[in-house]
Amino acid sequence: MILSRRSFLIGGSAAALASGCRGPRFIGSGDLRLGVISDIHIREPESAETTERAFRFYRSRGVDAVLIAGDLSDWGLLSGFRILKETWDRVFAGTGVVPLFITGNHDFDGWHYGDMTMEMHALGYDESEAAIKLGMRRCWEETFGEHWAPVRLRTVRGFDFVSCEWGADGEFVEWMKANGGRFRGGKPFFFFRHSPLKGTVCGRSAGDDAVKAVLEGYPNCIALTGHIHYPFNDDRAIWQGAFTAISVPSLSYSTAPEGHENGYDDRTGKSKLTMPLMTVRRDLRGDQGYLIEVRGDEVSVERYDFDEMEDGASDWSFSTARDAARPYAPEVRVREMPAPVFPAGAKLKVTTTNTDNRAGHWTIALDCRFPSAKVAGSRVFDYEIRAVPKDGSEPLVKRFLSPAFALMEKFEPKVQRFWFDVAELPQDKEYVLEVYARNCFGRASSPLVSAVRRGKPGLGKAVR
């Protein structure tokens, strides 16, 4: 008999529990099973197709609730809320599954974000139905049929969920002064807002440190945030300190961390980057989310890819008990996550190519190709290429992301490719190229090193 992966896990968990060992997923009464997504960015009805696909997956897995950590509507329009409600009702009407939704920045002001405005008008919508203009409370309560407030407490199967709406950090701090004693018992509870908490998960925060300071008094807190659109392939998406924080990836598209040659840059056509923008952004790929299961103070987080409809990476598991180990604390990850490794015999191949740079200008590029690296138990975060002068002067350092950085590992190319604009390279001096693969905490592989190279003077004579 051939068992599906899910059947195997159910059977395996039952056997593990019977023998006194914790299995990889939790089964049975008393559990909380929670679907978690973020940044669904609904525009017109067609844009809700991925959200509906995620909802149907969560229904098939018997969730008790589905949490969306903000940016429900791309343009902050009432129609976006209504499309979400219609999508929810098609899947969950009459099931008792609880919606746990909050607002993000787009739900308040996406209707005046430059290019968003162009798209909105092109598709036949306008700011006259902006929820913030019509009244956020009114739009929310009329659409979703539930009370809206800057801070809300909702309970699902005995587990508390405290939500903090966009811009409501101060209200949350005051609310916790009056209500924080409720969460002192040690049972896991969830805090969720749109932007990350400073000093926790990857990405830039858009909030006040005061919220983090409050949560530091609750080791049983699991904080869920969205906003940054980073994929869960980045293992900095989970953080443990005085509490646990998890960054929820976007269900609509992934974005790239700053500082990479094939990442984001000037959008006015004045970019000076040589490499083209990764297609993952143009193709709007990277639809990801979580299935969280809780039993007692034990938590398992399944990372799911809704493009491929399969697990996108290995589970995270931890305990919220006060004296429990913190396996996802940054200092532990830095120490224990191994450096990437290139395949045995890997070589760096270098040639030149005629191409256009990001701004569309003709460029001669040094075309560097080498095999993809791997890191045990995780993914390579990025690659660093250095042009290192032999005379000890300052090297030229560039970083780039694999074109599959936001996708499942099976899409990782066998060969990575990087372009240097030859005008940037050392002239009239010897240098070598060094290539390093790095994990998300900055630990680097041993380098691939080119033969010694020497550029000749004369690049200044070229017409550019």
Each model region followed by its residue ranges:
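Beta-strand-rich modules
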Residues: L425-G442
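Active-site neighborhood of phospho(di)ester-bond hydrolases with catalytic His/Asp-centered motifs
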Residues: I37-S38, V66-D71, P99-N105, F190-H194, ...
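Short acidic, glycine-rich surface-loop motifs adjacent to enzyme active sites
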Residues: R184-T200
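N-terminal secretory signal peptides and thylakoid transit peptides that target proteins
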Residues: M1-A15
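Recognizes extended acidic, P/S/T-rich segments that occur
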Residues: G11, E384-P426
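A short C-terminal boundary segment appended to hydrolase-like catalytic domains
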Residues: G28, S271-P403, P447-L448, R453-R464
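N-terminal active-site segment of His-dependent metallophosphoesterases
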Residues: C21-R82
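Extended active-site neighborhood of metal-dependent phosphoesterases/phosphodiesterases
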Residues: L78-G185, A210-G217, N233-P249, Y253-T279, ...
